[in-house]
């Protein structure tokens, strides 16, 4: 008799995705981040659901409702900090997942990669709107500054900003709609992640060597299920350590002050995971130019497959490209640091140089180095 998991209409989808899926035998721990992102999304949806039961999206009571969750709701503090720090873990996994894709040439799966880029935008939008909800000082001013950037769009800019605000400033209408979008977007992200997986399973996974692994496949279960479970346990260990010992480590103290439109904080800055893009935005004195650079800093990922000039897929056997890749990583860390600094002498020029280097590495240096490596190998 054929196994039920291979015949039942629902079970066979799960079977072909997580049990009998042929996987390369040599994929490393860098391939764990897909499943970790799935776990992060589940944690965020569940904690968010319980927070939404107690939160009120009204400018007068939003801040108080978050305080009420932390003080009066059973384990409310735990749910709130799991959600806030869960977002940080989500972005750590996202950056490592994208970095893995860049290093090992996973971007050659075009559909999977492009849906991944859209997912990155969707997660960033969701995180931004979530940061506005507690209605602290940094929530309010962050929302004001970032939405105001759209006014740089010619002709329709100012109308667009007022349309998003639902008035002439960030107010009750803005908070209510941000809450609505923040609630619905994770479910859209979950659906997109399903499509992301669908396209991945059309081609099969890449592997560290970048070579075709059809001749050497192993079943996903038990080999990679157990490996993924180890990754999940480590993720939960790091997240719970962060939540229980230092829940405010990655937050901003200004957000413990209720929003006040009459008092601007000395340094307006987003959460740490947006600082690299914020630094690129600030490094260009022109408003429209800054906004374009901000969008392009993420959108550039979509054109990475077009810039692949190497005859090898992975960077595993390309030492010069590896050097440039790690310079890019160092550059992004530098940009993240600069994004959190005030706009004054040494930081302005460092930010501008780091921004130029970021685009130069991806658009010019890496493709040229790949061609050089091709010639060195006499291919």
Swiss-Prot record:
Positions annotated to bind a ubiquinone: 201
Cofactor detail note: Binds 2 heme b groups non-covalently.
Subunit structure: The cytochrome bc1 complex contains 11 subunits: 3 respiratory subunits (MT-CYB, CYC1 and UQCRFS1), 2 core proteins (UQCRC1 and UQCRC2) and 6 low-molecular weight proteins (UQCRH/QCR6, UQCRB/QCR7, UQCRQ/QCR8, UQCR10/QCR9, UQCR11/QCR10 and a cleavage product of UQCRFS1). This cytochrome bc1 complex then forms a dimer.
Chain positions recorded as heme b b562 binding sites: 83, 182
One Pfam short name: Cytochrom_B_C
Keywords, comma-separated and alphabetical: Electron transport, Heme, Iron, Membrane, Metal-binding, Mitochondrion, Mitochondrion inner membrane, Respiratory chain, Transmembrane, Transmembrane helix, Transport, Ubiquinone
Protein name: Cytochrome b
Gene3D superfamilies per record: Cytochrome Bc1 Complex, Chain C
Annotated family: Belongs to the cytochrome b family.
Entry keyword RNA-binding: no
Role this protein plays: Component of the ubiquinol-cytochrome c reductase complex (complex III or cytochrome b-c1 complex) that is part of the mitochondrial respiratory chain. The b-c1 complex mediates electron transfer from ubiquinol to cytochrome c. Contributes to the generation of a proton gradient across the mitochondrial membrane that is then used for ATP synthesis.
Gene Ontology molecular function terms on file: metal ion binding; ubiquinol-cytochrome-c reductase activity
Main location: mitochondrion
Miscellaneous notes: Heme 1 (or BL or b562) is low-potential and absorbs at about 562 nm, and heme 2 (or BH or b566) is high-potential and absorbs at about 566 nm.
UniProt organism field: Pseudosoriculus fumidus (Taiwanese brown-toothed shrew)
Subcellular location: Mitochondrion inner membrane
Gene Ontology biological process terms, A to Z: mitochondrial electron transport, ubiquinol to cytochrome c
Encoding gene, per UniProt annotation: MT-CYB
GO cellular component: mitochondrial inner membrane; respiratory chain complex III
Membrane topology per record: Multi-pass membrane protein
Record field: transmembrane: 33-53, 77-98, 113-133, 178-198, 226-246, 288-308, 320-340, 347-367
Entry cofactors: heme b
Binding-site list for heme b b566: 97, 196
């Amino acid at each position: 008799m054929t196994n039920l998991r291979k015949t039942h209409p629902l079970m066979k989808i799960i079977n072909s995705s997580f049990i009998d899926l042929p996987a390369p035998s040599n994929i490393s721990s860098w391939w764990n981040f897909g499943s970790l992102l799935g776990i992060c999304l589940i944690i965020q949806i569940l904690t968010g659901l319980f927070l939404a039961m107690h939160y009120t999206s009204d400018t007068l009571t939003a801040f108080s409702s978050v305080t009420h969750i932390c003080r009066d709701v059973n384990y409310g503090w735990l749910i709130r900090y799991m959600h806030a720090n869960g977002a940080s873990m989500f972005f750590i996994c996202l950056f490592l997942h994208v970095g893995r894709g860049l290093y090992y040439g996973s971007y050659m799966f075009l559909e999977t990669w492009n849906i991944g880029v859209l997912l990155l935008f969707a997660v960033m939008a969701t995180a931004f709107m979530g940061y506005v909800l507690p209605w602290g000082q940094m929530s309010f001013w962050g929302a004001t500054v970032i939405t105001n950037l759209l006014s740089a769009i010619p002709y329709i800019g100012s109308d667009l900003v007022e349309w998003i605000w639902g008035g002439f400033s960030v107010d009750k209408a803005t908070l209510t709609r941000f809450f609505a979008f923040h609630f619905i977007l994770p479910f859209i992200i979950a659906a997109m992640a399903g499509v992301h997986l669908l396209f991945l399973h059309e081609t099969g996974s890449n592997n560290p060597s970048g070579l075709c692994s059809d001749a050497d496949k192993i079943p996903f279960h038990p080999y990679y299920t157990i490996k993924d479970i180890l990754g999940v346990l480590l993720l939960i260990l790091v997240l719970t350590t962060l939540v229980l010992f230092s829940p405010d480590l990655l937050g901003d103290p200004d957000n413990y002050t209720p929003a006040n439109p009459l008092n601007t904080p000395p340094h307006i800055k987003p959460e740490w995971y947006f600082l690299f893009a914020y630094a690129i935005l600030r490094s260009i004195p022109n408003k429209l130019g800054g906004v374009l650079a901000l969008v392009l800093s993420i959108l550039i990922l979509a054109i990475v497959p077009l810039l692949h000039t190497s005859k090898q897929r992975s960077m595993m056997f390309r030492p010069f490209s590896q050097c440039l890749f790690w310079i890019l990583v160092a550059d992004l860390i530098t940009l993240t640091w600069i994004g959190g600094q005030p706009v004054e002498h040494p930081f302005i020029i460092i930010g501008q140089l780091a921004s130029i280097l970021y685009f130069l590495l991806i658009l010019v240096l890496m493709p040229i180095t790949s061609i050089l490596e091709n010639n060195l190998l006499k291919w």
